[in-house]
């Protein structure tokens, strides 16, 4: 079996590559074809656990849309930013310390055989491989070390779509400029232009698409209307004022947006809960007005100690403590759990030592070994605003360094943290309003949403099918089939 390959390129970051790739995966899978996604290199702190290690969340969801088992080959190189100039390198699912220390140009050249082999294997095993590029293929300063855009397209002989965000303005210039900066052999792979996030009367675009085709020979094959609530998380995006489901707002969920936040995509299901508003918080003023029914969430972090220092510098530590002191609900997930404790102890120099926020009487000791695994566990008796979780069994995943345990001195004094999941996976304070857990993905479990909100949200299957229906409606007739002919 030698697969046909379709590749989604973008004129910029956030043009719409990830969701369009996901939509194409489901579109072709619904035809009974064996489909796999692929992105050679992804830079994101949003990761998922699969057999063999971890991959970017976008490729994980794309695999589910393709009705395929997520596989490390679908995202063979994952870069997880730790600092502005430093990333942890995950190669074929596993952290590679040597590559993490390398200069990026040399690293890119050294890993090309690995990422190319992963693609070749997927091409050999499937009918269709839907490939996602990164950023723009016209970054001429990066082209000599490209392992994610046109080098991949040429290797796979992919039929390429070039998508642009028309809502930003300058869409035709973006499309023409990107196309013009490609080599002639690369230009020949571009099969269609896609105008994404369009608002208004599509007839007003004329004569733009026609003139663009005269200049390039490439037709505009789709104009996709703006669609805020397609149901997929932005790969590295944030919530905004549109992050409220239908109905009056009855509860606010405030997520602390520290610089190295990770796995933010796990909060996507909350955007669809009626009456719930999600918002990012970067300053104490944004927590003003929260009531006891409102939540503050400390999400995962790729640099727990550094993000905790940032949180303190903003004054958010005092604002969070004040909310908890009023009986307000506080939830920490993974790195957020570690921050909520009394102390972070780092004997191996992994993340840094320091005091925690002191809202849970627990202590975290960082390990050299990284825990990366799926977990299924049930909550024990849980109190406070989380009482609905009592006895609920949830599926999720762990990605972290470190283990958390009771603070022995505080326990001796009577301030006891209550373990509410086996193996130290989750802890609750005596008052019941502060909960911390290592398990990512809790809100993606319908049982959790039902227990906490009495609400059901759209299933992933319905989201994927909606995406496929959407592109089937808005692409020019026959285009999507011609890409795999």
Swiss-Prot record:
Region forming the signal peptide: none
Positions of transmembrane segments: none
Lipid biosynthesis found in the keyword field: no
Superkingdom to which the source organism belongs: Bacteria
Domain GATase cobBQ-type, residue spans: 250-448
A GO BP entry: cobalamin biosynthetic process
Active site: 334 (nucleophile), 440
GO molecular function terms noted in the UniProt entry: ABC-type vitamin B12 transporter activity; catalytic activity
The entry's keywords: Cobalamin biosynthesis, Glutamine amidotransferase
Family annotation (SUPFAM superfamilies): Class I glutamine amidotransferase-like, P-loop containing nucleoside triphosphate hydrolases
Pathway membership: Cofactor biosynthesis; adenosylcobalamin biosynthesis
Protein's UniProt keywords contain Metal-binding: no
HAMAP family: CobQ (MF_00028)
Family designation: Belongs to the CobB/CobQ family. CobQ subfamily.
Function: Catalyzes amidations at positions B, D, E, and G on adenosylcobyrinic A,C-diamide. NH(2) groups are provided by glutamine, and one molecule of ATP is hydrogenolyzed for each amidation.
Name of the protein described by the UniProt record: Cobyric acid synthase
